[in-house]
Amino acid sequence: MDFDSYQHYFYDYDCGEDFYRSTAPSEDIWKKFELVPSPPTSPPWGSGPGAVDPASGINPGEPWPGGGAGDEAESRGHSKAWGRNYASIIRRDCMWSGFSARERLERVVSDRLAPGAPRGNPPKAPATPDGTPSLEASNPAPATQCQLGEPKTQACSGSESPSDSEGEEIDVVTVEKRRSLDIRKPVTITVRADPLDPCMKHFHISIHQQQHNYAARFPPESCSQEGDPEPGPQEEAPEIEAPKEKEEEEEEEEEEEIVSPPPVGSEAPQSCHPKPVSSDTEDVTKRKNHNFLERKRRNDLRSRFLALRDQVPTLASCSKAPKVVILSKALEYLQALVGAEKKMATEKRQLRCRQQQLQKRIAYLSGY
């Protein structure tokens, strides 16, 4: 607050300054517009020689009309520049006049919430001669312009302000869920002062606001037809249409499954239901037969390998011989058997020839 007290907010004692000379207020000044119930009272002018005016941010040493420091000629010149509005300006300083600002803001809110107020663009707060700034928020996105004070009143769910009469009807705001956007969009807030008051200054500030006001109402139809459509409803429309399309597709599929073609004779309803049942049973029987045959093939193959292993003398004692070893040993044993058979066949031929020779010798000797 020490740094903020030396900043220029709304009033500058030099009336000939440039338009953009006034510095933008800090975040603390916006708390003064939130209808503070008991704002602090204005400090007395004669509080002390080292006191600093928080509204103007000027040290007592600077030339002020009526102050005890500075040159008298300069103070007279400044008193002429300020004119007769000097005392009223100090009283109307936005940093210290909370009650008057509260009453005016409540009056504007009650006018907007009146039952006869149109739903279109809300009327702007009229410029009052006492220098009360009117806030106007404009969103750079293609949307209708709305007053800055309107979302606050809507967030209160239509609570009555003290200035509202008992007979007036107040719109109750229905809070609707809006999709929160992670993208922050800049919102420009322009504070306009009273054009009749030469001491008021204009200043522009740009802030970043996250668009997740769940209590904001949808724009009126008249504004949406005249201006560009808002991105919010357009972005929500595909989400709403997507489940509708899914539901329609599911309904169509159910209708296709339920609705059958017109029956031709009395066999049509019977032919519809047995087909899926027969197809299912056929699949089950085929699967069962395939599994049975596969198990039988595996059992037969295993039994053949076990029998082959038993026929090979070298593997008869190996109960856990692999199939490759069984095949290789069986091949070697088979080749050995084939060689032995050929050898025995040659010996048999030789023995037969010897037999024939011996029979001829016996016949020759018996002839004598």
Swiss-Prot record:
Region entry Disordered, spans: 39-79, 112-179, 218-295
Q: Where is this region: Leucine-zipper?
A: 337-365
Picking any one GO biological process from the record gives: regulation of inner ear auditory receptor cell differentiation
User: Can the keyword Lipoprotein be found in this entry's annotation?
Assistant: no
Basic and acidic residues biased stretches = 283-294
Q: Which GO terms describe its cellular component?
A: chromosome; nucleoplasm
What the entry lists under CDD domains is as follows:
bHLHzip_L-Myc
Acidic residues biased stretches: 247-258
Subunit architecture: Efficient DNA binding requires dimerization with another bHLH protein. Binds DNA as a heterodimer with MAX.
Supply the name of the protein.
Protein L-Myc
Recorded source organism is Mus musculus
